[in-house]
Amino acid sequence: MNRPPVGRLRIAILTHSTHPRGGVAHALALGEALCRLGHEAVVHAPDPTGRGFFRAARCPAISVAAKPVGGSAAALVGARIADYLAHFSTPAACDFDVFHAQCCISGNALATLTRRRLIPGFVRTVHHIDASTDAQLAQWEERAILDAGRLLCLSRTWAATLAAEYGARADVVGTGVDSQTYTPDPGPEDEALRRSLGLGGGPVFLSVGGFEARKNTLAVIEAFAALRRAHPGAQLVVAGGASLLDHAGYEARCCAALEREGLAVGTGRPVIRTGPVDQADMPSLYRIADTLVFPSLMEGYGLCVLEAMACGTPVIVSARPPFTEYLAPGEALSVNPEDTGAIAAAMEASLEPGRRGRLRNAGREVARAHVWDACAARHLPTYAELAPRDAPVLPAATGAAAWNTLRIPRDA
């Protein structure tokens, strides 16, 4: 079906944080791709530190004034909603054709702005849905979905969840990876990072996301401990962990497991916790790792999987959606994420030279298929449904962007 050309749009993209999290990285890359397609996309995020986004953006980006907040997760989310409402309290601040929420926080702010008639409505991307026992958080999660004018998901899995649990239809837009930044080509910075982390000659395994239950870090630690019996020089790098939520209880369990297994933590030790990693160092971190171990229990898509594959690093993932949507057998090692023995066996298998070569080649092909400009083009029909009709018309997308716009699955 031929779609009408989309006019030049001013798009406000709102995410929950300036920290290096998958949803934030997605928002920035989407904004950059939309600008390359001729639109004006401005990415917003609450910024209590005043330091700006975790990386320099190649599109307009606004750090929304926000104050540090202590206490419960509900108190934090409520404060961040209020920060957004204060920022968009004037017609001048609301001078956009399309408002696009990437999270529950911004979805609730835009829902309130819609009810106040400061904006005509908004698009919401649901990356995943966090289960919560807090009634207020659950209410906010539901409102940010049901009050949206249009819904998007990265995967068919989450689109199906929205249909089943909320009776809501979502279009599937996928995601992308920056193939100019994430490449398999080594550089001198790789060895410098290796030295700074104290990595030796043994195999290096990488876990991304910090100590967080959703990332299944405890199972990774236990699997790594089992693997070290055959590879005593192996090291595990646990990167990231910048989260708005409190994971102290789960972190304590991870630390107890490390102590129980006799795994020392620190530079040059069996386990290295980096905390948030500078964006400039991430490609090197993927390249110096032998394997990305990512048996996550719940993901919207798994951006770090694509980044690792683009860098030529073999990947271990959970044998469940959304990974099964875009990874065929032989493109990654798939495991039952609740079976630490299976994770350890996959870590061992990932070191076999022949298998490594096949995984590297297949992974790079997967990454090449995830193009940000094509992902951005898949957003445009949804934007056009909510945008005013008097914007100047841009030429229709051509090439890969047009192909993907027409062929992305539209119903889930």
Identify the meaning behind each predicted range:
Residues P4-G7, L14-R21, L28-A82:
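N-terminal strand-loop element at the rim of the active site
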Residues A12, L199-K215, I221-F224, V237:
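Conserved donor-binding/catalytic core segment of Leloir-type glycosyltransferases
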Residues A101-S106, V126:
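Short His-centered aromatic/hydrophobic patch
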Residues I145, S284-A289:
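Short alpha-helical donor nucleotide-sugar binding micro-motif in glycosyltransferases
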Residues L297:
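Aromatic "clamp/platform" in nucleotide-sugar-dependent glycosyltransferases that forms part
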Residues P329-G341, A349-G354:
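Conserved acidic donor-binding segment of nucleotide-sugar-dependent glycosyltransferases
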